[in-house]
Curated annotation (Swiss-Prot):
Tissue-level expression: Testis-specific.
PANTHER family: CALCIUM-ACTIVATED POTASSIUM CHANNEL ALPHA CHAIN, POTASSIUM CHANNEL SUBFAMILY U MEMBER 1
GO molecular function, one term: potassium channel activity
Short motif (Selectivity for potassium): ranges: 276-279
Intramembrane residue windows: 260-282
Cytoplasmic side: 46-101, 160-163, 210-226, 313-1149
Protein's name according to its UniProt entry: Potassium channel subfamily U member 1
Catalytic activity reported: K(+)(in) = K(+)(out)
Gene name in the database record: KCNU1
Length: 1149
């Protein structure tokens, strides 16, 4: 009927005819009939197949099964199945675009789909109610396209495993509702738009096509193409439906409410609906259209809220963070990469820009692998004048070129100390270094490393150069080194930390001791080139002059030997034999860089009579340009020093005594040879650490037998947390400072590790060459294990924080350390019945909590915290009433007393290493027992554990200062008179013994608030600072100086608080790592054997004091008897007068 009606029309006169309802129904019903009939057929077939399978299972081998398994039929069936399988595999390869033909096929289908959609756009310009005649050239083209779609649909149908699931797929529905109407149009010789708008859903395959064409490669481009395809396909499809129903009207009203709306207007309406903004100029009038708009609005809320902001972010990030940094000539900048997070960036900027915000002209370029978060963006905006963020990776040369790393002053690599896998973090940062060095070998690198054993890879990079400023900041090495120094010298951990912590928060304490502590926190380690007028003078002379005239505390210098193979490096408190040369770098403890510039400006001519430090400025006189210092100037300087000494001491200067440096050096060598005669083969090849043969783990593992207690005394207990799966923390870095060779073998304290045997077994291969180390399997949370280690008589208990766990709460990372501190702190020890010398009533305990009014004391504890904000838990256990109410760790009472440590401040060392890497080298030397970057360059790792080759190398390695804590009354400091102020003590100890005093450890004066007699640290007191009789003094003590006086044996037993005291050990064993017996044994007290002979030189001033024979004999008699030869040599030395030989000093290593 439809065909007859169409044939009666004249095509030339009526190219666009009106489509009747019957024609439109024919187009739509063809699609619905195809869809539902096919679905019903598939369902019926599946039901029949399942029934047959079920019947075969019930009946077993039936007639049908016999037919398939019989002879020729069975073989033909197998061949057909094989052919079908191969055919199906080929089709799947084509459809998955794994082959070139398959890729062409997929791309062709997408292109033809877009072509069919374009034809729909062209035909949509005609009214929906009209039908196109076959004279329209687009109809045959669209018919060809749909014929190809039919072929592709058949291939997909045959390759589908689940036919029903395939039939209900979106692409299948698109084909079913667009292909059949095309063939109906061929039969009716007319075409109608119908549901052809569904072809727009093929746009969802746009990301796949672009990936096949390799047009997109990055994740951002893939994400953007996916979002774009979703939005476009949704808009075009929804606009097509609105265009259809609005132009056709509601079917039950027979189109009476229809409106003439173009496809463009439909898209406009859909976009306005998607943005949830309706302008009202174009609206839906039909019920179907309005119902669709209601549901589409809900879907638009999800679409617009989720996808549009992400697209805007992609566009914004692309413009903001993917550009290149323009390196301007004359503009300095650094590149920072690695762990770019809110915490790391905040810590770095705070330290890099501290106190210099108006002076810094160095820009910071952050190279981050992920776009910054909103919080991080806010930080960058706050420091907009200094920071730039570039999105990229240090592993890619293209990104390194974008940040112009070859023009940067340095490249700083930040590590994440709280990561769960520290080894992986180190390896990734080392790979960044390798990438940067391969890109530009001259770029200066400063890298943070978490585990010390990963440091060895960096110097092996061919372009790594220590001399140009390449540096390594090892968290494990420094952190555990600080804790080890706190175990050796109570309070030293806080003393050293305060020199590198910058406090910007102003606190106004009321108590006097708090004011002293906070004022001392202003002192920092600063460097300055020394004035050429100091050339030719000894270090004690320069240190004394700087202290008295400039109020500067000089503690170390950078020494460069005149010989090619001589020692070059930093020396702490060098002996008088070391002479200051021109352009020597000095290390000071001072408050501001302005103060230390006085050491550069000092002129022996202009400042000869100047006694006010502020008046020592750059004089600019001609004498400063002289190449050599003249004798009159030296004499003038000596005369000035005499006057200052008399002014300070209030006494006439002692008579001048000259002695031969060569003879003193020989005597020192003889004395040391006697001291190390028994263990000269027990140091490593560098002479820096005590060494022993590898010891098996079983031999040092302490067995628990009943209620036994090992008779350790004056030992160090280290509480370790971890299991077999925990990352190693590098306990070797904790042991090395405790086994430094500048302590004699008798001074070494036993180390007892309490922890999991599975964990400590993994660490043991790095510890088995160190003597006197023991392992007690157990847990520090169990008091029974603590008692077994005889913790009551230990000199210090270090509670080490456990290795970080994956996805751990930052507040809970210190749970074990806090609970262990609580357990150990609750131990009450009866001091009246304790035979240990650690209970001294004459000298109150520095951290042992002993009180004269109480018979109980507490175990000295040093706790490590990973999260500094957890300090308030430790403050509650401190035993001090009215402590500093601060959440800042470095303003807490626990920190001021030296009972807590956190490595969080190590982040600031990046800025320190960039501005002045010499300060970092000094810190490494102080906390690691003498290891510096210069030593690491020359030491072969395989030889570190070897035996020292000779006594000469041994002595040169050992002959370095050690940090100690001395009493004003029970040590040789009692010979300093007067000693009422710190300035008098400094000059006297330096003159008499070469001991450099750097700080105080004072008892908190409020006794009612300090029942345990805790002490606090005072860093670099003022020259006029009044001393108290109970003060302990932080000192840099020469190796050849013994510090203890013992007129009677009982006095030594009263000196427990004096650090560097001889270790109280059990009876001597042939094996140094043999654990002490459980039974009680007779204990022997040892005292160090050193020379008391004063060091003198030709440029003598009040420090040169003649020691009479009776005093020498008195001092010598207080020590363990020397060998006959050593005694005779000592007596000879004390009576002789020598001339100076400046080259007799054996340079320290």
């Amino acid at each position: 009927m439809f065909q007859t009606k169409l044939r009666n029309e004249t095509w030339e006169d009526l190219p666009k005819m009106s489509c009747t309802t019957e024609i439109q129904a024919a187009f739509i019903l063809s699609s619905f009939v195809t869809f539902f009939s096919g679905l019903i057929i598939l369902l019926i077939f599946r039901l029949i197949w399942r029934s047959v399978k079920k019947w075969q299972i019930i009946k077993g081998t039936g007639i049908i099964l016999e037919l398939f398994t019989s002879g020729t039929i069975a073989r033909s069936h197998v061949r057909s199945l094989h052919f079908q399988g191969q055919f199906r595999d080929h089709i799947e390869m084509l459809l998955s675009a794994q082959t070139f033909v398959g890729q062409v096929l997929v791309i062709l289908v997408f292109v033809l789909s877009i072509g069919s959609l374009i034809i729909y756009f062209i035909n949509s310009a005609d009214p929906v109610g009209s039908c196109s005649s076959y004279e329209d050239k687009t109809i045959p083209i669209d018919l060809v396209f749909n014929a190809f779609f039919s072929f592709y649909f058949g291939l997909r149908f045959m390759a589908a495993d689940d036919k029903i699931k395939f039939w209900l797929e979106m692409n299948s529905i698109v084909d079913i509702f667009t292909i059949p109407p095309t063939f109906i149009s061929y039969y009716l010789k007319s075409n109608w738009l119908g549901l052809r708008f569904l072809r727009a859903l093929r746009l969802l395959e746009l990301p796949q096509i672009l990936q096949i064409l390799r047009a997109i490669k990055t994740s951002n481009s893939v994400k953007f193409s996916k979002l774009l395809s979703i939005i476009l396909s949704t808009w075009f499809t929804a606009a097509g439906f609105i265009h259809l129903v609005e132009n056709s009207g509601d079917p039950w009203l027979k189109g009476r409410n229809s409106q003439n709306i173009s496809y463009f207007e439909s898209i406009y309406l859909v976009m306005a609906t998607t943005s949830t903004v309706g302008f009202g100029d174009v609206v839906a009038k039909t019920s179907l259209g309005r119902t669709f708009i209601m549901f589409f609005t809900l879907g638009s809320l999800i679409l617009f809220a989720n996808y549009i902001p992400e697209m805007v972010e992609l566009f914004a990030n692309k413009r903001k963070y993917t550009s290149s940094y323009e390196a301007l000539k004359g503009k300095k900048f650094i590149v920072v990469c690695g762990n770019i997070t809110v915490d790391s960036v905040t810590a770095f900027l705070r330290n890099f820009l501290r106190d210099k915000s108006g002076e810094i002209n160095t820009e910071i370029v952050f190279l981050g692998e992920t776009p910054p978060s909103l919080e991080l963006e806010t930080i960058f905006k706050c420091y907009l004048a200094y920071t730039t963020f570039i999105s990229g990776s240090a592993m890619k040369w293209e990104d390194l070129r974008r940040v112009a790393v070859e023009s940067a002053e340095a490249c700083l690599i930040i590590a994440n100390p709280l990561c769960s896998d520290s080894h992986a973090e180190d390896i990734s940062n080392i790979m960044r270094v390798l990438s940067i060095k391969n890109y530009d070998s001259t770029t200066r690198i400063i890298i943070q490393i978490l585990q010390s054993h990963n440091k060895v890879y960096l110097p092996k990079i061919p372009s790594w150069n220590w001399d140009t400023g390449d540096n390594i900041i090892c968290f494990a090495e420094l952190k555990l080194g600080f804790i080890a120094q706190g175990c050796l010298v109570p309070g030293l951990c806080t003393f050293l930390t305060s020199l590198f912590v910058e406090q910007n928060k102003k606190v106004m304490p009321k108590q006097t001791w708090k004011k002293h502590f906070l004022n001392s926190m202003k002192n920092k380690i600063l460097t300055q080139r020394l004035s050429d007028d100091f050339a030719g003078m000894s270090f004690p002379e320069v240190a004394r002059l700087c202290f008295l005239k400039m109020h500067l505390l000089l503690i170390a210098i950078e020494y460069k030997s005149l010989f090619t193979d001589g020692f070059c490096g930093l020396i702490l408190n060098p002996p008088p034999q070391v002479r200051i040369r021109k352009n020597t770098l000095g290390f000071f403890i001072a408050e501001t860089p302005k103060d230390v510039r006085r050491a550069l400006f000092y002129c022996s001519v202009c400042h000869d009579d100047v006694f006010i430090p502020e008046l020592i400025t750059n004089c600019g006189c001609k004498s400063r340009s002289r190449q050599h210092i003249t004798v009159p100037s030296v004499k003038r300087m000596k005369k000035c020093l005499k006057g200052i000494s008399s002014r300070i001491s209030g006494q006439d200067s002692p008579p001048r005594v000259s002695a031969s440096t060569s003879s003193i050096s020989n005597f020192t060598t003889r004395t040391l040879q006697h001291d190390v005669e028994q263990d000269s083969d027990q140091l490593d090849s560098s002479g820096m650490f005590h060494w022993c043969k590898p010891t098996s783990l079983d031999k040092v593992t302490l067995k628990r037998t009943g209620k036994s207690k090992y008779k350790f005394r004056n030992h160090i207990v280290a509480c370790v947390f971890g299991d077999a799966h925990s990352a190693p923390m590098g306990l070797r870095n904790f042991v090395m400072p405790l086994r430094a060779s500048n302590y004699t073998r008798k001074e070494l304290k036993d180390i007892v590790f309490i922890g999991s045997l599975d964990y400590l077994q993994r660490e043991w291969r790095f510890l088995w060459n160190f003597p006197q180390i023991y392992i007690l399997p157990g847990c520090a949370l169990y008091s029974g294990d603590l008692h077994a280690a005889n913790i009551e008589q230990c000199s210090m208990c270090a509670v080490l924080s456990p290795p970080p766990q994956p996805s751990s709460n930052q507040t809970l990372v210190d749970t074990e350390a806090i609970m262990a501190t609580l357990t150990i702190g609750s131990l009450q020890i009866d001091s009246s019945s304790d035979p240990s010398p650690s209970v001294s009533e004459e000298t109150p305990g520095y951290t042992n909590g002993h009180n004269e009014k109480s018979n109980c004391r507490k175990v000295p504890i040093l706790t490590e915290l990973k999260n500094p904000s957890n300090i308030h838990f430790i403050e509650q256990l401190g035993g001090l009433e009215g402590s500093l109410q601060e959440t800042n760790l470095h303003l807490s009472t626990a920190f001021s007393t030296g009972t807590v440590f956190s490595g969080s401040f190590l982040d600031s060392l990046l800025a320190t290493a960039f501005y002045n890497y010499h300060v970092l080298e000094l810190l490494q030397m102080l906390v690691t027992g003498g290891v510096s970057s210069q030593l690491e360059q020359h030491l072969d790792k395989d030889k570190v554990y070897g035996v020292a080759d000779s006594c000469t190398s041994l002595l040169s390695g050992r002959n370095r200062c050690k940090l100690g804590l001395l009493s004003l009354h029970e040590t040789i400091l009692s010979d300093v008179n007067p000693r009422n102020t710190f300035g008098q003590l400094f000059c006297g100890s330096l003159d008499l013994f070469g001991i450099l005093c750097v700080g105080l450890y004072r008892i908190i004066d409020e006794e009612e608030l300090n029942p345990e007699n805790k002490r606090f640290v005072i860093t670099r007191p003022a020259n006029e600072f009044k001393l108290l009789p109970s003060d302990l003094v932080f000192c840099a003590i020469p190796f050849s100086t013994a510090c203890y006086k013992r007129n009677e044996e009982f006095s030594l037993q009263k000196s427990y608080e004096i650090v560097n005291k001889a270790s109280q050990t059990t009876e001597t064993h042939s094996d140094t790592n043999c654990p002490p017996t459980i039974d009680s044994v007779t204990e022997t007290l040892y005292s160090p054997v050193y020379s008391y002979q004063p060091r003198t030189n030709s440029l003598s001033f009040p420090k040169q004091i003649a020691w009479n024979q009776s005093r020498t004999n008195s001092i010598i008699s207080s020590q363990i008897p020397l060998g006959d030869n050593a005694k005779e040599n000592e007596r000879k030395t004390s009576d002789e007068v020598y001339d100076e030989d400046p080259f007799a000093y054996s340079e320290p290593l």
